[in-house]
């Protein structure tokens, strides 16, 4: 049985979502049609935090969500995480803090030189600081739950979030780039339907 663990980016990230629909609701409805065709062959999971987050973006909640998307929290008490992952996380955080400080120092220097554009400099500081500290890292408990659940059930993460995919790779977890997910579902549906025809 193939098990996919779904991230919000499939339904919320406009670049990914457009393959399924123009709005999060359309994207979910299209996805659920795939889930229906693959029912019994493929399972789709979401940790409760991600499920709740996705529901917040939907105009109406299709009842099929309850049928085709399994809500499961990871068993956080029994999952073992290799020590090297914690070491890497600490080193990564240290590098990011240093990088964030350099971004802040640069903004201060610019504001001293150009006192007329302090608001623009602060906006730029916030954007660059956020990028320095958050890009490429698991930055929420929901993201971490996604990774832990995939590890627990030996599932395949589907996400466009660079931080999630980076840490999934470091932990030896299978993943699919959300940008290619619809094509993968098309292939799976085709395979399932051809198997039915042969029987």
From Swiss-Prot:
Signal peptide: none annotated. It holds the Pfam family PIN_5. Coiled coil: none annotated. Keywords: Endonuclease, Hydrolase, Nuclease, tRNA processing. Its EC number is 3.1.26.5. It catalyses: Endonucleolytic cleavage of RNA, removing 5'-extranucleotides from tRNA precursor. GO terms for biological process: tRNA 5'-leader removal. InterPro entries: PIN-like_dom_sf (IPR029060), RNA_free_RNase_P (IPR014856). One of its GO terms (molecular function) is ribonuclease P activity. It is an enzyme of class 3 (hydrolase). RNA-free RNase P that catalyzes the removal of the 5'-leader sequence from pre-tRNA to produce the mature 5'-terminus. Belongs to the HARP family. NCBIfam families: PRK04358.1-3, RNA_lig_partner. This is RNA-free ribonuclease P. It comes from Pyrococcus furiosus (strain ATCC 43587 / DSM 3638 / JCM 8422 / Vc1).
């Amino acid at each position: 049985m193939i098990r996919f663990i779904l991230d919000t980016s499939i339904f919320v990230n406009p670049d990914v979502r457009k393959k399924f629909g123009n709005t999060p609701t359309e994207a979910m409805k299209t996805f659920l049609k795939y889930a229906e065709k693959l029912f019994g062959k493929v399972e789709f999971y979401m940790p409760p935090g991600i499920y709740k987050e996705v529901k917040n973006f939907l105009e109406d909640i299709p009842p099929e969500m309850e049928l085709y998307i399994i809500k499961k929290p990871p068993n956080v008490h029994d999952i073992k995480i290799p020590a090297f992952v914690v070491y890497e996380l600490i080193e990564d955080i240290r590098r990011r803090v240093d990088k964030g400080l350099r971004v802040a120092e640069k903004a201060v220097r610019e504001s001293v030189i150009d006192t007329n554009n302090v608001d623009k400099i602060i906006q730029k500081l916030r954007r660059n600081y956020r990028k320095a500290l958050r890009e490429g890292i698991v930055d929420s408990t929901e993201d971490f739950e996604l990774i832990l659940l995939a590890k627990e059930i030996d599932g395949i993460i589907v996400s466009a979030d660079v931080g999630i995919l980076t840490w999934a790779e470091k932990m030896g977890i299978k993943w699919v780039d959300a940008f290619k997910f619809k094509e993968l579902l098309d292939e799976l549906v085709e395979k399932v339907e051809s198997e039915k025809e042969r029987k």
